[in-house]
């Protein structure tokens, strides 16, 4: 049997319990077709980069699968039919990773607090310029412009 990593996105308006029910449903499909599901991770509700089927957020779920290709095809067929699944992707892998996935360790942009120093870091000073005084941006009067050559 081949090893796969499978990720799917579920609609934002279903509950976390319904997402768990979807995972169990697809786990049952894999096991009914002679496969095994190892690690299951629910990454929670995350913002999408762009809208998918009028959704701005989605529930993400990851499954490590050890199954024959026919089981994967049947699971993907049922996902295409389901209105709750926005997208899915199955990738064949050499071996499953140990420990939590990188996405589980990564925090969503919405979960982060404010950055230190506001939007920008501290202002840098350059060695060849005098230090700027905040609020006073005048550097003296500008010299007169030279006449343009095309109008002379």
UniProtKB/Swiss-Prot annotation:
Domain of life of the source: Bacteria
Cysteines engaged in disulfide bonds, as pairs: none
Keyword Ribonucleoprotein in annotation: yes
Keyword Mitochondrion included in the entry's annotation: no
InterPro entries for this protein: Ribosomal_bS6, Ribosomal_bS6_sf, Ribosomal_S6_plastid/chlpt, Transl_elong_EF1B/ribsomal_bS6
GO molecular function: small ribosomal subunit rRNA binding; structural constituent of ribosome
Region of interest (Disordered), residue spans: 96-152
Family matches, as NCBIfam families: S6
Function: Binds together with bS18 to 16S ribosomal RNA.
Stated name of the protein: Small ribosomal subunit protein bS6
Gene (name only): rpsF
